[in-house]
Amino acid sequence: MNWLDELKWDSQGLMPAIAQEQGSNDVLMLAWMNREALQKTAELGRAVYFSRSRNKLWFKGEESGHVQIVHEIRIDCDQDVILLKVTQTGHTPGIACHTGRHSCFYRVYENGEWKVTDPVLKDPQTIYK
């Protein structure tokens, strides 16, 4: 059996993928992968996702230069969620979020509202030309 066949893909052939920073263990982002994206990620050693809005493979960093080097690919106990242990490149500290922040999880719920807790490290207008 092919290793990709052991996974439980959803009805659209997709699976959520969490990118976690190697070393700090910060959760950087959640994206989606199809079989081809996961296969390319394993082959290339860099994160390749599937863009649901563009309906195509998304090579992380192809526009921004903020590539994710993949050190390890894990699967959860139900075999329906992927975890990538990555090094975020292209800026120090690494920028994973399209808003110019280190992580896409930069808002925290406090006292009935969402508060921004993490700074913008680079203006998104200068990231995406």
Swiss-Prot record:
| Known pathway | Amino-acid biosynthesis; L-histidine biosynthesis; L-histidine from 5-phospho-alpha-D-ribose 1-diphosphate: step 3/9
Catalytic activity reads: 1-(5-phospho-beta-D-ribosyl)-5'-AMP + H2O = 1-(5-phospho-beta-D-ribosyl)-5-[(5-phospho-beta-D-ribosylamino)methylideneamino]imidazole-4-carboxamide
Write out the annotated subcellular location: Cytoplasm
UniProt keyword Heme, yes or no: no
Cellular component, GO, one term:
cytoplasm
> Where is Mg(2+) annotated to bind?
76, 78, 80
Binding-site positions, Zn(2+): 77, 97, 104
Cofactors? Mg(2+); Zn(2+)
Q: Which residues form the signal peptide?
A: none
Give its E.C. classification number: 3.5.4.19
CC cofactor note = Binds 1 Mg(2+) ion per subunit. Binds 1 zinc ion per subunit.
**Entries under InterPro entries matching the protein:** PRA-CH, PRib_AMP_CycHydrolase_dom, PRib_AMP_CycHydrolase_sf
Q: Is the keyword Amino-acid biosynthesis assigned to this protein? A: yes
What processes does the entry annotate via GO biological process terms? L-histidine biosynthetic process
Q: Name one GO molecular function term.
A: magnesium ion binding
Q: Which UniProt keywords are given for this protein, alphabetically ordered?
A: Amino-acid biosynthesis, Cytoplasm, Histidine biosynthesis, Hydrolase, Magnesium, Metal-binding, Zinc
> Pfam family of this protein, just one?
PRA-CH
Kindly report the protein's main subcellular placement as a broad class.
Answer: cytoplasm
HAMAP family, per the entry:
HisI
Q: Which family does it belong to?
A: Belongs to the PRA-CH family.
What job does this protein perform?
Catalyzes the hydrolysis of the adenine ring of phosphoribosyl-AMP.
Q: How does it assemble?
A: Homodimer.
- Provide the protein name: Phosphoribosyl-AMP cyclohydrolase
Q: What species is this protein from?
A: Albidiferax ferrireducens (strain ATCC BAA-621 / DSM 15236 / T118)
